[in-house]
Curated annotation (Swiss-Prot):
It catalyses: L-methionyl-[protein] + [thioredoxin]-disulfide + H2O = L-methionyl-(S)-S-oxide-[protein] + [thioredoxin]-dithiol; [thioredoxin]-disulfide + L-methionine + H2O = L-methionine (S)-S-oxide + [thioredoxin]-dithiol. This is Peptide methionine sulfoxide reductase MsrA. GO terms for biological process: cellular response to oxidative stress; protein modification process. Keywords: Oxidoreductase. Gene3D superfamilies: Peptide methionine sulphoxide reductase MsrA (3.30.1060.10). GO terms for molecular function: L-methionine-(S)-S-oxide reductase activity; peptide-methionine (S)-S-oxide reductase activity. The active site is at C58. The gene is msrA. It holds the Pfam family PMSR. Belongs to the MsrA Met sulfoxide reductase family. InterPro entries: Met_Sox_Rdtase_MsrA_dom, Met_Sox_Rdtase_MsrA_sf, MsrA_MetSO_reductase.
Amino acid sequence: MTLRSEILVNKNVLPTAEQALPGRETPMTLPETHFVNGNPLLGPFTSNVEFAIFGLGCFWGAERRLWQQEGVVSTVAGYAGGFTPNPTYEEVCSGLTGHTEVVLVVYEPEKISYDSLLKVFWEAHNPTQGMRQGNDIGTQYRSVIYCTTPEQLAAAKASADAFQAELSKAGLGGITTEIEEAPTVYFAETYHQQYLAKNPQGYCGLGGTGVCLPA
C-alpha cells in the first residue's frame, strides 16, 4: 500500500479515501457572472442549457478553449473525481485529494452539440499520458470526461473508440481518459475562474496530438 508521505513525493498515485485530506463543508464563493461573456456563471439561465464536465490538464487553458466555442453559455473551473470536499488549490496540488482539474461547461444544445464538445476535448489535449498533461505532472492533470446523462456516457465512450482508432493509425498510444458518471464538482477559487482572460500572458500548457476526430 502506498503511504501518504509517498503520494506527496510521487504525484502519479491516487490516494485512498482514508488517505485523502478531510476538506471542509463550506464551498468556494464565486462571482455571479462570467468574466468573459457576462452571462450568469451558474444560472439562472434564460435559454435551454445542458451541462458537461471535462478534464484535459490545467484548467486555465482548458476553460479558455471551451468558452471560445459558439453555443457555450458559461464555464466554471473546478475539481472533481476525488474524495476531499471543497478542496483548496493547494490541497489539490498536494495529490492528497484525488481530484483532477475540470471545467464545468454550460451549453445550448441547439447551438453546439455534445458531440462537437467531445471533438474539441479530444483534439485539444493528449489523452494518452495518464497522470500528466505535457509538463504538468500529477493526478490533478489526468484526462477525464464526467457525464451528466446516460446519453453523454454512451456518446463519450463511442467517441473514445473512434479517437483511439485514429491515434493508433498515427502510431500513438492508448487512451487513459476516465469516462464515468459525473461526481460532485467542487468549484475552484475565484482567481482561477476565466484565468487566462484576466491574465492573457498566463501559463497555458494545453496541446493536442495533431490527430483529428472524424466528424
